[in-house]
UniProtKB/Swiss-Prot annotation:
CDD domains on file: EFh
Tissue specificity of this protein: Found in cell lineages giving rise to the aboral ectoderm, a squamous epithelium covering the surface of the late stage embryo and larva.
Keyword Nuclease in annotation: no
Record-listed Ca(2+) 1 binding positions: D23, N25, D27, N29
Entry binding sites for Ca(2+) 3: D121, D125, K127, E132
InterPro entries: Centrin_CML-like, EF-hand-dom_pair, EF_hand_dom
KW Phosphoprotein (keyword) present: no
Chain residues that bind Ca(2+) 2: D84, D86, K90, D95
Protein name per the record: Calcium-binding protein SPEC 2D
Keywords on record: Calcium, Metal-binding, Repeat
GO molecular function: calcium ion binding; enzyme regulator activity
């Protein structure tokens, strides 16, 4: 799972503890109606639209892998916005993508970053949109 490469073991344990607080039946999921509070417990606020979409997609429950994916999605968006220095075109250059990936994982190699960028095949003149960045990170293994 990509989360193991992008979150430290301590972070995963912390997120699991937060998740377990909402998994009151100890059955590996919690009702999606608690997702907003669960995300807030790890420092992320979901918009009303994100909550509504999650309720539709998750069909009533949220598992730990889904919870980690939502945290990762929020983290990707935060990193993207921090790295998009000019904020005019809402795109990251290859160098900004490299810096963003290093902010996720200090152990990642330049070769791995280059490979990821090449595989992502950004259609915007070699630049990466927010959606492309999130997809690239989610596929990172």
């Amino acid at each position: 799972m990509a989360a193991n490469l992008l979150f430290s073991e301590d972070q995963i344990k912390e997120y699991k503890t937060k998740f377990d607080a909402f998994d009151r039946n100890n059955d590996g999921n919690f009702p999606t109606m608690f997702l907003g509070n669960a995300m807030k417990s790890v420092g992320h606020v979901l918009t009303a639209a994100e909550l509504e979409n999650s309720r539709r997609v998750r069909k009533g429950t949220t598992t730990f892998p889904q919870f980690l994916a939502m945290i990762l999605d929020k983290k990707c968006r935060k990193v993207f916005k921090a790295m998009d220095k000019d904020d005019k075109d809402k795109l990251l250059s290859a160098d900004e993508v490299r810096q963003a990936m290093l902010s996720f994982d200090r152990q990642i190699t330049e070769d791995k970053i280059k490979e990821m960028i090449e595989k992502a095949d950004f259609p915007n003149d070699g630049k990466c949109s927010l959606e492309e960045f999130v997809k690239m990170v989610m596929n990172f293994c």
